[in-house]
Each structure stands twice: as C-alpha cells, then as structure tokens.
Amino acid sequence: MKNLIVSLAVVVTASLNPVLAHATDSDPRAEKVFSEKFAGAQNIKWTRLDDGYLRVSFVLNGVGAESYFDRDAALVGTVRNLFYGQLPLSVIQTIANKFGETCVIEAKEITNEDGTSYKVIFEQKERKYSVRLSSLGEVMDVQKEKIKK
C-alpha cells in the first residue's frame, strides 16, 4: 500500500502546476545523487515544491524527464516522456485490446522503488482516459472523464 501511495505521489507531483512551486533551489546532497545517476543531463532546473520535495527537470539523450527527491535528498522516482511507439509492446497491445482505436496525447514512463510503470493519456470518442499500466501490460488504474466541448 505504501508503495502504491509513493507511486501515485510521484505521478500527481509530476502533473502539479508550476504555480505550486516556489524557490528554485536545490540540495547539495540531491545534486550529488543526481549527477551520479544522470551524468550528461542538460537543461537542468531544480524546483522546491510546497511539500518539501525537490523536482529536477532535465533532458538526457534528447528525452525530457523529471526526477523527484524527498527531504532527505533520496531519489524517490523519475518520470520520462515517451512517444507512444517507445512503450513496451505489452503496454501497446493492452491499450489496443482493451480500448481499441485511440488518439494518444501523452505517454510517460514512471520509475520508482516499485519498479517501472507507464501512464498513457488518450482520447476516445467523447472521453479522455488516463491509464496506468505495469511493464507487463497489466492495467493498474483507469481514470476517465467526459470531454467538454
């Protein structure tokens, strides 16, 4: 349960508006961990969030990503932007089999202590879906809302 909460916290925090962020400072301990784990990262921007967590946005090998550090400067998770075709085949097949034809808006890879999962946001007919899947293509969570026109 704790792992699920941490996973959800990373996803929710990743979608927080920059308005919730304040001083763009970092922690030297987190900077050290970051530089070891993400050597070669560019366009690095540190932001301290209202909950005390640090978010670092960066580009690594041409791919945008964000990592999150807790108050003790421990890395709690990383969210990486992907193209739909970069998702594991099992994830793509599950979406195709369960939802049929979709218009994918966003695909993200979430890595934390629980492992790797994927969040795919897509539209279908008059609904917008946010689906979280395991690396094996198992659906972990589905949220849907009606598209207002």
Question: Where on the chain are the PLM-derived regions?
Answer:
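Interaction-mediating elements
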Residues: 22-149
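Bacterial Sec-dependent N-terminal signal peptides
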Residues: 1-26, 34
